[in-house]
């Protein structure tokens, strides 16, 4: 039986818990990234965090000593925006989220609105308001489709776990009887979109 060895040309890796943990560098991560860059390998760093834009995340990683260009960062916000662009180009959305998500949606030509949006999109935010959640519930009840950037129920913080997208999506789902479509990890869609973004493929 002959074994064929294929050369790995593209790497997808998790940011959280693989390269950094609560904004502290995991030992060896900087050497690994440097090695990929030195050998010309394509790579994308993946994160379910939708708060920050890739530029913001690149700056935050640089503070830990990790030099990752913004074009090598793929967030659940980017994956969500690309997914919605394929489903309904130039659509509209009501967003519970921050700059990472709103910027990604604007970049694909989406209009953000509270009036009769095509989608309600729930992402990470450090301040979920009762008013915004209530608005989301009413819009979904009126027919807007329900999308969430990722299913993670909690996220890390220096003080301990805090509620994240999955928990808030569950609250809205309970109130509406509508389950969201989760775009981020572990949905393979996020990985496929990432590979497409750097023009690679999986085998």
Residues covered by each model-derived region:
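HAD-like aspartate-dependent phosphatase fold
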Residues: 2-15, 19-203
